[in-house]
Regions:
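N-terminal Rossmann-like FAD-binding beta1-loop-alpha1 element of flavoenzymes
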Residues: 2-30
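N-terminal FAD cofactor-binding segment of flavoenzymes
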Residues: 20-73
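Helix-loop-beta segment of a Rossmann-like dinucleotide-binding subdomain
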Residues: 74-96, 129-131, 218-232
Length: 427
């Protein structure tokens, strides 16, 4: 059967879009370097309200109602009010990776997705169709597959999709451990989104780029603790993060007893949007869909895959002779409409600011941000608020922020001005 859409990749983005396209009756093939059934190594977290709105709460392995962050100055005195947590009042969950993968795999298989193992190498467009040359996993030769449209879902280092070069890309870096500890590293039953306390560091170290602890109780004596740098170019090295994690724990009298799994996390936070007039479409990390202010992606994949698949299916049916460029065009418009592009520009502008903030500024900023009404900070973090709603939230943040944060928000440095202009000019 001729292929309508060839999806490249076998991560969450590839499976999500392949399932949605195939369920709309399209002939879909997935070309992946690895077996799509190979277990994923990343842990994926999501807010409870976000997963509930998608009706997918059953895909979670863990969830927490006791969710908080620490933005105080972090003296070691527990009686110090600066040590009290900011309570988020919203549930947070971790996906069961196997169940999430299975959820998409089963839908792909039921809808007849064809699996091809190989490394995509070259893309060309002839007679209005797309041809992909790939190195098959089980043969020495190069093979060719033709499709009406190619969707590049090969992750952040995308194989085909092109984007403008706009300078250094900031990476979110983290080093984490799932394991057992000599004492609970967080309160039993607790999820900590960001612990910015830094009293385990010297004054000189506190001048270096700040990092925070992301941590959770997994039950039965197991915890996940991860030292994280929100975003930096070049990224904070793993060795620094590991050392900071160990020192943070030691400062609280906690040592790692048994390592079950180590997580090395690095992905780009502010990739420029791809060119929206190219004849190949993209989805997921390849399409710069990671939220530039939080690093989250999975919720966006689940929300946006049906919208994109519907647009592609409609374009294919509307014009059975449509060329790849035309189909990709319909897809890009659905994936990155002006409203989402404006929001992306706004988040990128915000991230640029945060990357310049000192440790006290960051703590004060986040403390103010999470004091906003819950709908406002949640709408910002999950990308469900409209542009006007985001602007209202940001104005409120500015009005209620302390002076050190106001000063940081007002001063324009580096490429902030260009990003701000981009925000105004996005159409
Ligand atoms: C450690 C870590 C933790 C994260 N935690 C979260 C989280 O909690 N919540 C969240 O929402 N996001 C999280 N993210 C961010 C984001 O969700 C992930 O990076 C996500 O895996 C990106 O999905 P993707 O499908 O776009 O790309 P990937 O998962 O990177 O998948 C790319 C796929 O393409 C294949 N491929 C690549 N090149 C080729 C080629 N030439 N030919 C054929 N196949 C190819 C690869 O083999 C792979 O199967 C995390 C990221 C990391 C690294």
């Amino acid at each position: 059967m001729p292929t309508d859409v060839l999806v490249v990749g076998a991560g969450p983005a590839a499976l999500a879009i392949a399932a949605e396209l195939a369920e709309r009756g399209l002939a879909v093939a997935v070309l992946a370097a690895t077996d799509p059934r190979d277990p994923w190594s990343n842990t994926y977290g999501i807010w409870g309200d976000e997963v509930d709105a998608l009706g997918l709460g059953h895909l979670l392995e863990h969830s927490w109602s006791d969710t908080c962050s620490y933005f105080g100055s972090g003296s070691s005195d527990p009686a110090d009010p600066a040590n009290s947590p900011t309570r988020h009042g919203r549930d947070y969950g971790l996906f069961d990776k196997t169940r999430l993968q299975q959820f998409w795999l089963e839908r792909c298989e039921a809808a007849g997705v064809q699996w091809i193992r190989g490394l995509a190498e070259e893309l060309s467009h002839g007679s209005g169709r797309s041809q992909v040359r790939y190195a098959p996993a089980l043969a020495a030769d190069v093979a060719l597959i033709e499709a009406r449209l190619v969707v590049d879902a090969s992750g952040h280092k995308a194989v085909f999709v092109q984007r403008p070069e706009l300078g250094p890309v900031a990476g979110q870096a983290a080093y984490g451990v799932v394991g057992r500890f000599t004492a609970p590293p967080v309160q039993p039953g607790q999820f900590v989104l960001m612990d910015y306390r830094a009293d385990h560091l010297s004054e000189a170290e506190r001048q270096e780029p700040p990092t925070f602890l992301y941590a959770m109780d997994l039950g039965q004596g197991r915890f996940f603790v991860e030292e994280t740098s929100l975003a930096l170019a070049p990224p904070v090295p793993y060795a620094t993060l590991k050392q900071r994690l160990e020192r943070r724990l030691a400062h609280r009298g906690v040592a790692i007893e048994q390592v079950e799994h180590e997580e090395f996390c690095l992905f780009p936070m502010n990739l420029p949007l791809p060119d929206l007039d190219q004849p190949v479409l993209a989805f997921g990390g390849a399409a710069a869909m990671v939220h530039p202010a939080s690093g989250y992606l999975v919720g966006a994949l689940l929300r946006r895959a049906p919208v994109l698949a519907a647009a592609v299916a409609q374009a294919l049916r509307a014009n059975p002779a449509a060329a790849s460029a035309e189909l990709a065009q319909a897809g890009w418009q659905a994936l990155w409409p002006p409203e989402l592009r404006r929001k992306h520009a706004l988040y990128q502008f915000g991230l640029e600011k945060l990357m310049r903030f000192s440790e006290p500024q960051l703590r004060a900023h986040f403390s103010t941000f999470f004091s906003l009404p819950k709908e406002q900070w949640y709408g910002f973090l999950v990308n469900t608020a409209s542009v006007p709603e985001l602007i209202v939230a940001m104005l409120r943040l500015f009005a209620t922020a302390p002076w050190n944060v106001k000063a940081g928000l007002m001063g324009m440095q580096g490429r902030e001005l260009a990003l701000g202009m981009g925000l105004i000019l996005t159409r």
